[in-house]
Amino acid sequence: MDGKAVAAAVKERVKMAVAELKSGGTDPCLATVLVGDDPASGTYVRNKHAACAEVGITTQDHRLGPSTTEGDLLKLIAELNSDRSVHGILVQMPLPEGIREIKVVSAISPLKDVDGLTPLNAGLLTAGTATLIPCTPLGIMEMLDYYNIELEGKEVVLINRSRLVGIPLHHLFLGRNATVTTCHSRTKDIGSISRRADVIVTAVGNRDKFVLTPDMVKEGAVVIDVAISRSDRGLTGDADYAAVSEKASHITPVPGGVGPMTVAMLLKNTTTAASLVKSLER
């Protein structure tokens, strides 16, 4: 499954949505907030700005020093919430010690929550009525649809229970009438569970503790590998890619699978947020 190709198709649709919004007087704008000087976080933010430029989304780049307090950050978020020219707010994680992530995320306006992580948007997702959905889960669903993977009545196993991936995916798959099982670090004998799955989504990210091997996958299953592990071999996912590819009908590579979809969905969510704000201004 080629995440780059699917992401390119999504970006073309986003370009059209941006052009339509601009023709109606709305210039979609994403504001990013980076606290501290973590090099990896800086790279991620630059990549997001570059992706926005590709599709015509305007950006604001807010950089705060490592001595920034939680109060300073909350004040900036309040300003961005009230700024009518800003449609999406993204606070790059992780945050420095002493700043509570839940406090920061909860401060973002749900209408501008392009990460889909505010308590309100998380609750709407459980009810099946969310408009802004976490980018990685949304990208996974987009990729499955692109490849015409039928989900209704299928058995899905998630090997992750985080609020970024596993929990949102659980609700998204339930909404598509799949039967969903969630595995995690305390699950005993994950292979006995994953072997019955039609779709496996794995996002552990620690090859020393977990590798998805062919004996854990049934013939013809779809394998979505969200994980990224760095080693002297380069970037790898959870799956033993070459071996599992022999059994899977579809599998995502690492890199080049889910990663590009996450960025593409950020762009999509930004245009969705701009449309929401525009509709409320009528």
From Swiss-Prot:
Keyword Nucleotidyltransferase: no
Keywords: Amino-acid biosynthesis, Histidine biosynthesis, Hydrolase, Methionine biosynthesis, Multifunctional enzyme, NADP, One-carbon metabolism, Oxidoreductase, Purine biosynthesis
Pfam families cross-referenced by the UniProt entry: THF_DHG_CYH, THF_DHG_CYH_C
Coiled coil: none
GO biological process, one term: purine nucleotide biosynthetic process
Gene3D superfamilies reported in the protein's UniProt record: Leucine Dehydrogenase, chain A, domain 1 (3.40.50.10860), NAD(P)-binding Rossmann-like Domain (3.40.50.720)
GO molecular function: methenyltetrahydrofolate cyclohydrolase activity; methylenetetrahydrofolate dehydrogenase (NADP+) activity
InterPro entries named in the record: Aminoacid_DH-like_N_sf, NAD(P)-bd_dom_sf, THF_DH/CycHdrlase, THF_DH/CycHdrlase_cat_dom, THF_DH/CycHdrlase_CS, THF_DH/CycHdrlase_NAD-bd_dom
Reactions catalysed, as given in the entry: (6R)-5,10-methylene-5,6,7,8-tetrahydrofolate + NADP(+) = (6R)-5,10-methenyltetrahydrofolate + NADPH; (6R)-5,10-methenyltetrahydrofolate + H2O = (6R)-10-formyltetrahydrofolate + H(+)
A Gene Ontology cellular-component term: cytosol
Annotated binding of NADP(+), by residue: N160, R161, S162, S185, I228
CDD domains: NAD_bind_m-THF_DH_Cyclohyd
Tree of life domain: Archaea
EC number: 1.5.1.5, 3.5.4.9
The keyword Cytoplasm appears for this protein: no
Pathway assigned to this chain's UniProt record: One-carbon metabolism; tetrahydrofolate interconversion
Protein family per UniProt: Belongs to the tetrahydrofolate dehydrogenase/cyclohydrolase family.
PANTHER family to which the protein is assigned, alphabetical: C-1-TETRAHYDROFOLATE SYNTHASE, CYTOPLASMIC (PTHR48099:SF5), C-1-TETRAHYDROFOLATE SYNTHASE, CYTOPLASMIC-RELATED (PTHR48099)
Function: Catalyzes the oxidation of 5,10-methylenetetrahydrofolate to 5,10-methenyltetrahydrofolate and then the hydrolysis of 5,10-methenyltetrahydrofolate to 10-formyltetrahydrofolate.
HAMAP family per the UniProt record, alphabetical: THF_DHG_CYH
Subunit structure: Homodimer.
Name of the protein described by the UniProt record: Bifunctional protein FolD
Source organism of this protein record: Cenarchaeum symbiosum (strain A)
Gene: folD
